[in-house]
UniProtKB/Swiss-Prot annotation:
Ubiquitous. A lipid is attached at residue 114 (S-geranylgeranyl cysteine). SUPFAM superfamilies: Ubiquitin-like. It comes from the Eukaryota. It is found in: Cell membrane. One of its GO terms (cellular component) is extracellular exosome. The lineage of its organism: Eukaryota, Metazoa, Chordata, Craniata, Vertebrata. It is a lipid-anchor. The modification Cysteine methyl ester is found at residue 114. This is Ubiquitin-like protein 3. Keywords: Cell membrane, Lipoprotein, Membrane, Methylation, Palmitate, Prenylation. InterPro entries: MUB, Ubiquitin-like_dom, Ubiquitin-like_domsf, UBL3-like, UBL3-like_ubiquitin_dom, UBL3_Ubl_met.
Length: 117
């Protein structure tokens, strides 16, 4: 499929946690939530074991980061006419940026200061 990608489209190769992959064509105007809904509505037969109950819990991961629902493929500056790899996971909520690290620092009470005598 990836060899015949239209020049105005983006081919996404989605990888599940199980390692199964499937390719889908999208417009640069499609958002992460549009993609999740499309994949849910067109769930591949060989992914049947990983079927989820709702498109709202499908999350895309690109370059190690969760994509929020309103982010478009065009905003990510993905190359047109080429294949881009993303991971697809089922997750109820997205983590807040740096929230866990901040909480850990507050709990320890550690201070990073320097005393000059």
């Amino acid at each position: 499929m990836s060899s015949n990608v239209p020049a105005d489209m983006i081919n996404l190769r989605l990888i599940l946690v199980s390692g199964k992959t499937k390719e889908f064509l999208f417009s640069p105007n499609d958002s992460a939530s549009d993609i999740a809904k499309h994949v849910y509505d067109n769930w591949p037969m060989d992914w049947e074991e990983e079927q989820v109950s709702s498109p709202n819990i499908l999350r895309l991961i690109y370059q190690g980061r969760f994509l929020h629902g309103n982010v478009t493929l065009g905003a990510l500056k993905l190359p047109f006419g080429k294949t881009t790899v993303m991971h697809l996971v089922a997750r109820e909520t997205l983590p807040e940026p740096n929230s866990q690290g901040q909480r850990n620092r507050e709990k320890t009470g550690e201070s990073n200061c320097c005393v000059i005598l």
